[in-house]
UniProtKB/Swiss-Prot annotation:
Coiled coil (UniProt feature): none
Name this protein carries in UniProt: Poly(3-hydroxyalkanoate) polymerase subunit PhaE
Regions of compositional bias (Low complexity) in chain numbering: 331-344
Residues spanning the membrane: none
The keyword Manganese is annotated on this UniProt entry: no
Activity sensitivity to pH: Optimum pH is 7.8.
Entry's family note: Belongs to the PHA/PHB synthase family. Type III PhaE subfamily.
Gene responsible for this protein: phaE
GO cellular component: polyhydroxyalkanoate granule
Amino acid sequence: MSNTNFFNDDWLELQRKYWDNWTDMSRKAMGLDSASSSATTPWEAAIDQWWKAMAPAAPDLSRSFMEKMMEQGKNFFRLADTFAKRADEGNAGNGLELWTKTLEDMQKRFSGSLDDGGNTMQRLMSFWELPLDNWQRMMSSMSPMPGDMLRNMPHEQFKDSLDRALSAPGLGYTREEQSQYQELMRSAMEYQAALQEYTNVYTKLGMKSVEHMGSYIQGVIDSGKTIDSARALYDNWVACCEGAYADEVATPEYARIHGRLVNAQMALKKRMSILVDENLGALNMPTRSELRTLQDRLQETRRENKALRHSLHSLERRVAALAGEEPATKPATALRSPAPAAKAPARRRTTKTNPAD
């Protein structure tokens, strides 16, 4: 009896359920309810249903791009729904109080993201997610651990205790290895602190965007104009976010924070590379440094061989010139002139003679 169907269908389904259960357990452990991540508006639900129907047929290269586009559409409906709910709950005639209360709620979402590891910000304010997501993908590709394991790790609670533990000297015949692991932990803690500072910058950017949006709405109210559609509101919200981002990244403080993050990441990568090379060497496998040395030596050998060929051809030409002869062979790098095409031999014209003549 063949078990092909079991391994093709049932086994994959079992694996999917296994990881789904682990995901649900991790979300419950972090205080995240699965219902809170569901669609909050009918338009979001419609977008989700449409994407579920179209996602299997979408190419892999464009699937991530389409997911970002779907998220932008959801943000549009969330923003419109936020202002619409506030208008339904309060007095629609008092427009200034309505806008002020709504912007205060949005600003509280940003300030709350400092305490819950960024989960609140990813709900409505996910437009700042792309730069952080690109950085996390890069770190995940460099790290032996899956994902960015240091993103939400608490730092201030046990920093002093961990520093004291890492300052202990190594003992025994493994003291060198112990010191290397201590340096790795110090580099990891420095990178984690730099990453949290970098994440807080984007949280402050969100709060500044809300302030810019409040100034824009106040100007609209003072001028007596009206906002005709949710699309115009969303376009101005995006413009406020882009303006806040452009102002922030041009400051020396952002350059310092970003430079600290890059330096910490490179130091952590260097420590990881050293430990990986030592483990590979213990297994009698070629390490990264050995492969790099081999590549450098091969390149040097190629250059030396090329220089020797040129010297040999130069000597051949000199010997041939002294002997008054042409060299038997030409350098392989010499350009050859195209040989002229041989002409076909001319055919003799024969004239017929008349027998009478």
